[in-house]
UniProtKB/Swiss-Prot annotation:
Keywords: Amino-acid biosynthesis, Arginine biosynthesis, Cytoplasm, Lyase. Its main location: cytoplasm. HAMAP family: Arg_succ_lyase (MF_00006). NCBIfam families: argH. It comes from Chlorobaculum parvum (strain DSM 263 / NCIMB 8327) (Chlorobium vibrioforme subsp. thiosulfatophilum). Coiled coil: none annotated. This is Argininosuccinate lyase. GO terms for cellular component: cytosol.
Length: 463
């Protein structure tokens, strides 16, 4: 007997006179990927079967039989008793075929009024909803860790940077609160997407709806969707929600990647601002002294994967005519990979950050000796009614003088300061202390200790 004759009959096979080519079947099979959707597929099928029974499209007994059978199939998949193979074409076929083996002819009524198109669209939205909630939870955990770090280091002074050059002193707590804000917007983006994703496509069928007296609103209610599709073509033929999800994840990964860059730099011997627990570092196979921030490096590297997934999806969808096209099957690998990569990156990165600490003695020494207080000199002169551009020019000359004479700004004498401007008096030295500089900031959301405390309190109240 040939391989072709041994092949399982496919759900759509009856119209064709020849069996589907085996290599073509293996090429088009997606069960090795969409197997991840088995929970969502069974969840959607239970809702559909329940609605069919309630509307009298199938009998109440058949509906109950299908629902119980689907629950049994789910248990078999979870226990490993039912293992999909590529000949099954996709996870939906696996479930339906096994259901037929368990309950007999009633299984054939499950697909009444439903197409694979609205079935897959429903599964995808359920998957998006679950993973949105998962990622929002991880982002909130990250924010909680960052709040704890901000609280711990709110009175620690360190450099803020622009162009990777020391710029001005700031509260280290202010740094952590910046990340808190960024991850907060990431969570907001996902929460906003959830509203659009939480609409049921069930009832759209292939793309035109169904002649059967379906009740899409009831299916939506059973699946805890907020509403029903407005247009049946749109319900099955777009993947903008998948693209939006991967885009939102790309933003999360971008933030994690930037944060990783700081961790990598700050844990280097050249910076030595930050120490990381041995539990989240690796060594070298040849250099015994090495302690590498590999988790941060991997997160930074995995960001490229998620960016690639976004471009993958945009490219898949860019030329497709309405409504459904088989190309859309290829949305699953980038979607699933993005969800898992982003979730695992958030989880391990948060735990790593939890086990880091700032080297406060080094930060205090460096900020006291640095030229990063130059802006304070310029603003001191502005308070003396000198136009800012003139104050900036004068301060630039003072900085050049300090570099030439190997002095720090606080060690320049008053007589020396007065050679640059008669406006200087003893008060300049009050401004040339890192803590005074930080706490002199008056604008809302600034880096002063008081402002950081307010940011922390507001964030804790809203969390």
């Amino acid at each position: 007997m040939s391989d072709q004759s041994k092949q399982k009959e496919l759900l759509w096979q009856s119209r064709f006179s020849e069996p589907f080519d085996r290599e073509a079947l293996q090429f088009s099979s997606s069960v090795h990927v969409d197997g991840l959707l088995y929970r969502e597929d069974i969840q959607g099928s239970i809702a559909h079967a329940t609605m069919l029974g309630e509307e009298g499209i199938i009998s109440a007994g058949e509906s109950e039989q299908i629902v119980e059978g689907l629950k049994a199939v789910e248990k078999e998949i979870e226990s490993g008793e039912l293992v999909p193979v590529w000949e099954d074409e996709d996870i939906h076929t696996v479930i339906e075929n096994r259901l037929k083996e368990l309950i007999g002819p009633a299984a054939g009524k499950l697909h009444s009024g439903r197409s694979r198109n609205d079935q897959v669209a429903t599964d995808t939205r359920l998957y998006l909803r679950r993973n949105i909630d998962r990622l929002v939870g991880l982002l909130e955990a990250m924010q909680s860790t960052l709040l704890d770090k901000a609280e711990r280091y709110k009175s620690t002074i360190m450099f803020g940077y622009t162009h990777l050059q020391r710029a001005q002193p700031m509260s280290a707590g202010h740094y952590y609160m910046a990340w808190h804000s960024m991850f907060g917007r990431d969570a907001e983006r996902l929460a906003d997407l959830r509203k659009r994703a939480n609409i049921s496509p069930l009832g759209a069928a292939a793309f035109a709806g169904s002649t059967l007296p379906l009740n899409p609103a009831r299916s939506a209610e059973l699946l805890e969707f907020d509403g029903v599709f407005a247009n049946s073509i749109d319900a099955v033929s777009d993947r903008d929600l998948v693209i939006e999800f991967v885009s939102a994840c790309s933003m999360i990964m971008m933030h994690l990647s930037r944060f990783s860059e700081d961790v990598i730099l700050w844990t280097s011997a050249e910076f030595n601002y930050l120490s990381i627990s041995d539990a989240f570092a690796t060594g070298s196979s040849i250099m015994p002294q090495k302690k590498n921030a590999d988790i941060a490096e991997l997160v930074r590297g995995k960001t490229g994967r998620v960016y690639g997934n976004l471009m993958n999806l945009l490219t898949i969808m860019k030329g497709l005519p309405l409504s459904y096209n088989r190309d859309m099957q290829e949305d699953k690998p980038p979607l699933f990979d993005t969800a898992e990569t982003t979730a695992s990156s958030l989880s391990v990165f948060r735990r790593m950050i939890e086990k880091t600490w700032l080297n406060e003695e080094r930060l205090a020494k460096l900020t006291a000796e640095d030229l990063s207080l130059a802006t304070e000199i310029a603003e001191y002169l502005v308070k003396k009614q000198i136009p800012f551009r003139d104050a900036h020019r004068i301060t630039g000359k003072i900085v050049a003088y300090a570099i030439e004479k190997s002095k720090t700004l606080p060690t320049i004498s008053l007589d020396e300061y007065r050679t640059f401007s008669e406006s200087f008096d003893e008060g300049i030295y009050d401004d040339l202390k890192p803590d005074a500089s930080v706490n002199s900031k008056k604008t809302a959301g600034s880096c002063s200790f008081k402002s950081v405390e307010e940011q922390i309190a507001r964030a804790r109240k809203n969390s």
